[in-house]
Swiss-Prot record:
Any Gene Ontology CC annotation: cytoplasm
SUPFAM superfamilies recorded: Protein kinase-like (PK-like) (SSF56112), SH2 domain (SSF55550), SH3-domain (SSF50044)
Protein name per UniProt: Megakaryocyte-associated tyrosine-protein kinase
Domain of life: Eukaryota
Protein kinase domain ranges (all copies): 233-481
Entry EC number(s): 2.7.10.2
Reaction(s) the record says it catalyses: L-tyrosyl-[protein] + ATP = O-phospho-L-tyrosyl-[protein] + ADP + H(+)
Places the protein is found: Cytoplasm; Membrane
Catalytic-site annotation from UniProt: D350 (proton acceptor)
Keyword Transferase: yes
SH2 domain boundaries: 120-209
Naturally occurring in which organism (per UniProt): Mus musculus (Mouse)
């Protein structure tokens, strides 16, 4: 029998998944923290929310929706009777009524293709298979699997002593939890937490059991020559800070570089997988990856772009020093970088002037293009950059090249306002509500009418009506020629080659 954790939680013993244990006196097993009353109250689902059904309705009454347990639906509207909703079934496409009691939040269950790249995620395997994978026993050896008994759920499996303990991951108000005391936005956050603090589980998570046959991003990077030597790296002053670590100035083999330091090993793995994508991208308008260093987390070594981010560049120079033609060139540079990403079917997710860097020769370069997705995994929707994020991404988490186009429209407004914050004097809530009702920003002072028209096309409510970046590049090229400036040639370079020793920075 598996050992009990020091706090009452939902446990499963060898081969069994979690069951709701009876309430036990905290004097027997240490402190017990029940979920707050508010967390146990039924949730009101807003239109557009994706939910999962908790039961089956195979014989619906007229007007009701037919569904099976584990089906995904999208809420269309709440009924006057607050215990019912009208929803659309993802599989059949049918619309109908279903009871609120049959629903739970499905946001955490949305398929994330990068989850399969996590070294500890084994997908759909049984509890018995998990036990076999976690042999020989080793305290803290772990994996995460999809539940066979509860479709859509996850199970954390941990080796401890001679046992493998299975913790069912519960869904509470759009978050994930094991003990109903500590909640997480996603599985990556949960795993990272338990590598630092064992909390309600039997032991800290120490070592992931890698899925057999899966090639790690680390192996791919090493084979291609992208792993750099820590001994050649000198770190300098901090020049920025992101959600998961600092950005530092540095030198590698005597050349200036920028270094993003991700300290947590589990978070570093997510960034490492994203970095593997970046090695295959080369374009004059993308900040160049030079390599990575694995040491107490992850160092991502990038080219140093001397004039800093575009927001500060514009704010510190203003109209007196930066002409309209230069603004158009910056916008075109960004659009060309994004057209390249779009052609590779990659989505940035955090396109904004703060993430555009300006080189010594005034070339604008898109940064964090391979890392935005890893960063967004650790953020809940309330912490997304609301003023730059497309409505469908805010509402339903639907990121695409078209949501990047929306963000590009906001970036255009930033550029032609010389670095002002968009939606001035409006709170995030006011912005979200106003945009949903059709509000769009007025043009900045001095902005050409044709550029504001382009912004408007980027802000179409229907994503399909927004132009692709290819069309945006064509439009900005015409604008530049109309003011007597030749548009630069395309910036694509050779792809997929890692830096050789002679190319080391």
């Amino acid at each position: 029998m598996a050992r009990r954790s020091s706090r009452v939680s939902w446990l499963a013993f060898e081969g069994w998944e979690s069951r709701d244990l009876p309430r036990v006196s905290p004097r027997l097993f240490g402190a017990w923290h029940p979920a707050p009353a508010a967390a146990r109250m039924p949730t009101r689902w807003a239109p557009g929310t994706q939910c999962m059904t908790k039961c089956e309705n195979s014989r619906p009454k007229p007007g009701e929706l037919a569904f099976r347990k584990g089906d995904m639906v999208t809420i269309l509207e709440a009924c006057e009777d607050k215990s019912w909703y009208r929803a659309k079934h993802h599989g059949s496409g049918q619309e109908g009524l279903l009871a609120a009691a049959a629903l739970r939040h499905g946001e955490a269950l949305s398929t994330d293709p990068k989850l399969s790249l996590m070294p500890w995620f084994h997908g759909k395997i049984s509890g018995q298979e998990a036990i076999q994978q976690l042999q020989p026993p080793e305290d803290g050896l772990f994996l995460v699997r999809e539940s066979a008994r509860h479709p859509g759920d996850y199970v954390l499996c941990v080796s401890f002593g001679r046992d493998v303990i299975h913790y069912r991951v519960l869904h509470r108000d759009g978050h994930l939890t094991i003990d109903e005391a500590v909640c997480f936005c996603n599985l990556m956050d949960m795993v990272e937490h338990y590598t630092k603090d064992k909390g309600a589980i039997c032991t800290k998570l120490v070592k992931p059991r890698r899925k057999q046959g899966a090639k790690s991003a680390e192996e791919e990077l090493a084979k291609a020559g992208w792993l750099l030597d820590l001994q050649h790296l000198t770190l300098g002053a901090q020049i920025g800070e992101g959600e998961f670590g600092a950005v530092l100035q540095g030198e590698y083999l005597g050349q200036k570089v920028a270094v993003k330091n991700i300290k947590c090993d589990v978070t570093a793995q997510a960034f490492l997988d994203e970095t593997a994508v970046m090695t295959k991208l080369q374009h004059r308008n993308l900040v160049r990856l030079l390599g990575v260093i694995l040491h107490h987390g992850l160092y991502i070594v990038m080219e140093h772009v001397s004039k800093g981010n575009l927001v500060n560049f514009l704010r510190t120079r203003g109209r007196a020093l930066v002409s309209t033609s230069q603004l158009l060139q910056f916008a075109l540079h960004v659009a060309e970088g994004m057209e390249y990403l779009e052609s590779k079917k990659l989505v940035h997710r955090d396109l904004a002037a703060r993430n555009i860097l300006v080189s010594e020769d005034l070339v604008a370069k898109v940064s964090d293009f391979g890392l935005a997705k890893a960063e967004r995994k650790g953020l809940d929707s309330s912490r997304l950059p609301v003023k730059w994020t497309a409505p469908e991404a805010l509402k339903n988490g639907r990121f695409s090249s078209k949501s990047d186009v929306w963000s590009f429209g906001v970036l255009l407004w930033e550029v032609f306002s010389y670095g002002r914050a968009p939606y001035p004097k409006m709170s995030l809530k006011e912005v979200s509500e106003a945009v949903e009702k059709g509000y769009r920003m007025e043009p900045p002072d001095g902005c050409p009418g044709s550029v504001h028209t382009l912004m408007g096309s980027c802000w179409e409510a229907e994503p399909a009506r927004r132009p692709p970046f290819r069309k945006i590049v064509e439009k900005l090229g015409r604008e530049l020629r109309s003011v007597g400036v030749s548009a630069p040639a395309g910036g694509q370079e050779a792809e997929g080659s890692a830096p050789t020793r002679s190319q080391d920075p």
